[in-house]
A protein has these predicted regions:
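Rossmann-like dinucleotide-binding cores of NAD(P)H-dependent redox enzymes
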Residues: 1-51, 56-59, 66, 125-133, ...
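Flexible, glycine-rich terminal cap/loop adjacent to redox cofactors
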Residues: 161-172, 177-282
C-alpha cells in the first residue's frame, strides 16, 4: 500500500483482534501514521466491479444505519480459508472431522483411520507455513518409526508483514492471568523509541513481554509470551520463541548480551526491565 490511499475494513473492533491489545493499539497507531484509513466493526455486503479498473465495496457497520461505500483500484479480500473436506469420497472414508470440517488428529498427525495422516491447514490450529513444515517433520519421523516430539503450538510464532511488522509468540497477559498453574504473572512494556537503531530508522513500535512462574517453581519466573511491533519483528520473535520454548529463567535471559546498535537490543532491554533492572527506560 506504499504511496497509495488505502482503506482497511475490519470485521472485529480492532486490528489483530486475537493478539495482545497493546500490540494491536501500537500497530493501529503506526498504520494511521502511514496514512491508512482503518474502519472497524464492518460487514462487506457487496463488491461492484465494472468495465473500468477498480471496484466499489459496500459495507455496513455495527451500531450504524445505512450502507457505506469505498472505491478502490485494487480490492484484496483476506478473510481466511475453509478446508475442502466435504466431498462425498471424503465423507465415506471415515476420517473424523470437527465442526469446522478440519481433520482431527492426535499429537503426531494420525487420523481416526489407521495409516492415514494429516497436517497443515486442513487440521485445527493456526494456518501457518512454518507450523505445517514442523508437522511434516513430526509425521515423517513417526511414520519412519522414530520417536518425534509433538509440535508445541505454544511456541509457534505468528507474523504480520505490515509496516512496521507485527509478531507474537506464547501467551497474552489475559491468557496467562487466567491460568491456574501460573503465578506472579506480569507484563513488561518497552517503547521501541528507546532503542538507538529505531531512532535511526524513524519508525515506531513496542515490545510487550509476559512473564510468570509455575506453581511448581514459583521462585523461577520465565518468559511466557512476547508481542513485538517494529522493523524486523519477524526476526526478533525467533529469540523470544527460544526463551519461551526452552523455559529459560528470566534472570538468565536478561544477562544475554545484544550487539549495539541493533533492533535486538530492544528485546534485551525489555528482558532487563522485566528482571527489575531497567537500563534506558523506567
Amino acid at each position: 500500500a506504499a504511496g497509495c490511499e488505502t482503506t482497511l475494513l475490519i470485521r472485529k473492533d480492532r486490528v489483530l483482534s486475537g493478539w495482545d491489545r497493546r500490540a494491536a493499539t501500537t500497530l493501529t497507531r503506526e498504520l494511521k501514521r502511514h496514512g491508512l484509513t482503518i474502519v472497524t466493526r464492518t460487514h462487506v455486503t457487496q463488491v461492484d466491479t465494472g468495465a473500468n479498473l477498480g471496484a466499489t465495496v459496500h459495507y455496513t457497520r455495527d451500531g450504524e444505519d445505512g450502507d457505506h461505500t469505498v472505491y478502490g483500484q485494487i480490492v484484496l479480500a483476506a478473510i481466511g480459508r475453509d478446508p475442502i473436506t466435504d466431498a462425498g469420497w471424503f465423507s465415506s472414508s471415515g476420517i473424523a472431522r470437527d465442526d469446522h470440517g478440519l481433520i482431527v488428529t492426535d499429537q503426531l498427525g494420525r487420523t481416526s483411520v489407521p495409516g492415514i495422516w494429516a497436517l497443515g491447514d486442513v487440521t485445527p490450529g493456526h494456518a501457518l507455513a512454518h507450523r505445517a513444515f514442523e508437522q511434516g517433520i513430526t509425521v515423517a519421523e513417526a511414520i519412519a518409526g522414530l520417536d518425534p516430539k509433538p509440535v508445541d503450538d505454544a511456541t509457534i510464532p505468528q507474523v504480520v508483514f505490515s509496516s512496521p511488522e507485527a509478531a507474537c509468540v506464547g501467551l497474552t497477559l489475559d491468557q496467562a492471568s487466567a491460568r491456574d498453574d501460573l503465578v506472579e504473572v506480569s507484563e513488561t512494556v518497552y517503547p521501541m523509541m528507546g532503542n538507538a537503531r529505531m531512532l535511526m530508522s524513524g519508525s515506531g513500535g513496542s515490545i510487550s513481554l509476559v512473564s510468570g512462574a509455575s506453581v511448581a517453581d514459583p521462585d523461577t519466573p520465565v518468559v511466557l509470551g512476547a508481542h513485538i511491533i517494529g522493523p524486523i519483528a519477524s526476526d526478533l520473535i525467533a529469540e523470544a520463541e527460544q526463551l519461551i520454548g526452552n523455559r529459560v529463567p528470566l534472570h538468565d535471559a536478561a544477562r544475554l548480551i545484544h550487539p549495539h546498535p541493533t533492533f535486538s537490543e530492544a528485546l534485551g532491554e525489555t528482558l532487563l526491565k522485566a528482571d527489575g533492572r531497567p537500563l534506558n527506560t523506567r
